[in-house]
């Protein structure tokens, strides 16, 4: 895709799953990729503002940011507690805000930048057993729209990608915990109009498009990559 070669690109949560697929696609396009992850070297905890500041300073002028890091555990809301909420909020909402707050000033100064945040269709339509997570993902969608308006004249484009049911470790853990994972996998597959679950590479393709020069006239948008499981007007 146009305009990715040589771009300094930060991917949070890029050590595994969807994040790792995004990293590989950017590298294939010639981007210089830096991973912010607890498992990266050096490790970066996005819930720690000072740690993010240091990592951003060390990265140099960041052209593209992919806010991908996230975590969830499926629990009915009435069986959760404030400590659980705080953990979900710290990783899925405060973490992306920390990274944005540290990265965006440099983009504003240079007059250009692309930001793609990975949310979830849980933040658009809700998802049973994911109340705090859904709230966070709805929050980052609203945050992105607001920042897209604030920074549109500064040359910065911010958009959201919402994965649907995607083959990741988090989904696998949920299915194993629910019992009879193969039966559940087949039920999920039948629910998706295109007839399969998503792959991390499916999400990566959408992210790269939004980060490329081909998406220069797109900002403040939320794109579901769900095989048609959710369809939004």
PLM-predicted stretches and their roles:
Residues 100, 136, 144:
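Active-site helix of classical SDR
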Residues 158, 163-173, 177:
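Short, flexible catalytic-loop segment of classical short-chain dehydrogenase/reductase
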């Amino acid at each position: 895709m146009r305009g990715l070669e040589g771009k300094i690109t930060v991917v949070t949560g890029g050590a595994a799953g969807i994040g790792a697929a995004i990293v590989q696609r950017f590298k294939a396009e010639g981007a210089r990729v830096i991973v912010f992850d607890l498992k990266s070297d050096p490790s970066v905890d996005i819930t720690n503002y000072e740690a993010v500041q240091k990592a951003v300073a060390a990265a140099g002028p960041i052209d593209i940011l992919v806010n991908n890091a996230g975590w969830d555990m499926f629990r009915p809301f009435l069986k959760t507690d404030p400590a659980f909420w705080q953990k979900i909020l710290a990783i899925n909402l405060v973490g992306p805000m920390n990274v944005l707050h540290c990265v965006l000033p440099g983009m504003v100064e240079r007059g250009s930048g692309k930001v793609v945040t990975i949310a979830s269709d849980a933040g658009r339509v809700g998802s049973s057993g994911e109340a705090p997570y859904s709230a966070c993902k709805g929050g980052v969608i609203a945050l992105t729209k607001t920042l897209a308006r604030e920074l549109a004249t500064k040359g910065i484009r911010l958009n959201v990608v919402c994965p649907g049911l995607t083959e990741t470790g988090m989904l696998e853990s949920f299915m194993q915990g629910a019992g009879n994972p193969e039966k559940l996998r087949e039920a999920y597959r039948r629910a998706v109009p295109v007839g399969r679950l998503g792959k991390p590479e499916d999400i990566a393709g959408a992210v790269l498009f939004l980060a490329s020069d081909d998406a220069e006239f797109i900002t403040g948008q939320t794109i579901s990559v769900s095989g048609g499981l959710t369809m939004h007007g």
